[in-house]
Amino acid sequence: MASLNHPSDLKYSKTDEWVRVEGDQATIGITDYAQDQLGDIVYIELPWDASQSVSQETKFGDIESVKATSELLSPISGEVIKVNEALKDTPELINDKPYEDGWMLVVKLSNPGEIDNLMSADQYKAYLQGR
């Protein structure tokens, strides 16, 4: 686990999603730990039509790997304003660069205070060690 990357400028959920907040918008993806546990990602289902809403701790999609299928839970609430269309044809971007090219959604925050419910990188690392 020591070789896994968890950037300090992001926030993390207990369900292994990350959030990058920029003003009133947030980018969402899954952590390096999550993609490592899943193995090779072969398919992802996201709300491809922007303008849908997501709610904190509720399902926003599914991710399928050679090992398993898992639900994606939103770490924050808001309106989807952008979806990473590249993941339709190349879901392996999530394995290759989970914090860069492997991002999933950009959301306009509806409740910025929810960010306070998420963990810092150090808190997330400690959480993973306690699993």
Regions found by a protein language model. Give the residues of each.
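Short connector loops at helix/strand junctions that flank enzyme active sites
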Residues: K67, L73-P75, E100-G102
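Short glycine/proline-centered loop/turn elements that form peptide/ligand docking sites
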Residues: D49, K67-A68
